[in-house]
UniProtKB/Swiss-Prot annotation:
Organism: Novosphingobium aromaticivorans (strain ATCC 700278 / DSM 12444 / CCUG 56034 / CIP 105152 / NBRC 16084 / F199)
Family matches, as Pfam families: QueF
Biological process annotations from GO: queuosine biosynthetic process; tRNA modification
Name of the molecule in the record: NADPH-dependent 7-cyano-7-deazaguanine reductase
Binding site for substrate: 86-88, 105-106
Top-level EC class: oxidoreductase
UniProt EC number: 1.7.1.13
Location within or outside the cell: Cytoplasm
Entry GO terms, CC: cytoplasm
Its biological purpose: Catalyzes the NADPH-dependent reduction of 7-cyano-7-deazaguanine (preQ0) to 7-aminomethyl-7-deazaguanine (preQ1).
């Protein structure tokens, strides 16, 4: 293994990753699709510690697969890291790649959670997709990899249920 590198599991294979992130500090264009997006991972700075990382994307967008109209969501991703953590700029580019992707709310939300879990191999991961109403009905989608580790502090995701103007 090269000096300054670490091993992090990604998908079905072990990947040797440099300690230098792929995108951080670099000019990076938005991937054309989620399939083209590369998620980058760095070594967990606190291996062995039980803690949670939260990412919130309050202005997430994708496209309705039927009408082609934009759909908007507030995503909250929580995870207890294992050997590696997702690099935040890579995650931002991955999430941004959905703005021209057509998918149902359920597929988009669960797909994001499963890809992160499958590649990063955290101890635990959950995602909440709080979708804004289209056709008068808000849709909230929740997925988690399994029960959270005992002793992990799990704050509420902090997104109020949709109440409209009433």
């Amino acid at each position: 293994m090269p000096s300054g590198a670490f091993r992090c599991r990604s998908g079905h294979k072990a990947v040797v990753m440099a300690n230098t992130p792929l995108f951080l500090g670099q000019n990076s264009s938005l991937p054309a699709s989620p399939d083209e997006a590369v998620l980058d991972y760095v070594a967990n700075p606190r291996p062995g510690a039980l803690y949670m990382i939260r990412f919130a994307a309050p202005e997430f967008t994708s496209l309705c697969p039927v009408t082609g109209q934009p759909d908007f969501a507030h995503l909250v991703i929580d995870y207890a890291p294992g050997e590696c953590i997702v690099e935040s700029k890579a995650l931002k580019l991955f999430l941004g790649s959905f703005r021209n992707h057509a998918g149902f709310h359920e597929d988009v939300t669960v797909g994001i959670g499963q890809r992160l879990f499958d590649e990063m191999k955290p101890q635990w991961l959950r995602i909440g997709g709080y979708w804004y109403p289209r056709g008068g009905i808000p849709i909230d989608v929740f997925w988690q990899s399994g029960p959270p580790p005992a002793g992990l502090w799990l704050p509420d995701q902090g997104v109020a249920p949709y109440r409209g103007r009433g």
